[in-house]
Amino acid sequence: YSIINGNCQDVLSTYGENIFHSCITDPPYGMGMDDWDHSVPTVEIWQEVYRTLKPGGFCLSFCSPELYHRMAVNVEDAGFVIKDQIMWMTTTKMPKHNRLKPAHEPIVVAQKPYEGSLKNNHDKWGCGLIDTDNNRVAWEKEPPKGWVKGGAKRRTFGREGKTTGSQKEFGTVDANPNGRYPSNIIGSVQSDHQKYFYAPRATRKEKGKDNDHPTVKPIDLMAYLIRIYCPIKGSVLDPFCGSGTTGVAAMREDREFVGIDLSKHYTEIATQRCSVEEVSHLVLNPLADMLY
């Protein structure tokens, strides 16, 4: 891993093209009074991210509901293609003044256009696909049997079952025992069968006693996004790494990591957290590198 203190636009300009497999970041939301938080990252910053990502690489950026449009436009104007929007449900936030209770944070999901066909791009650059099958959301109970609300058992068209009168009854496919297909909602929703990956806000224990960063994301959340959008043994860029949660998650998932932050204070915290994670990873997985 590498943690760098500096302006991310300046730092990235020293890198060559097509370096990273993915960018997963939690940048300033443009909602504060400080100089670094008076606006969302500029098009020029995202252009440097675009330049250093491999063709087909994904760029995920957290943002506020109020300025999602501005973040998405800047990312798109840098050359990315907007592919999706993920909603992280954050139901523990408290309402402020005369407003609705904040309950989610959106994530812009964008992709650097791939070269030629998706298969050829993946063969050449090692990215462009997302890993959904290995990141299914596990059933809370036994996989549902029979038809359940929400379509856990799907009708299949083109494979005919029996015919009753003039109506055709088609076959069905049972629910996948490994869980539901991951969705673009991350959070907790009441259900007989868990529909979404659950990622509560980071606890004080997870942050560390000396971590005073105001918007620390949970490690499980970042690890989940990395597993889906960054190939195994790939590299993750975080140009606004803060206290290093993305780096810790990347190391847990056996990905390379480069983090950049303007604050020397937070890069020191990020370096310390990643160092602890590195030692823990080596102790728990002494033969990890030999398995690949």
Segments from the language model and where they lie:
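Core catalytic lobe of class I
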Residues: Y1-V279, V283-Y292
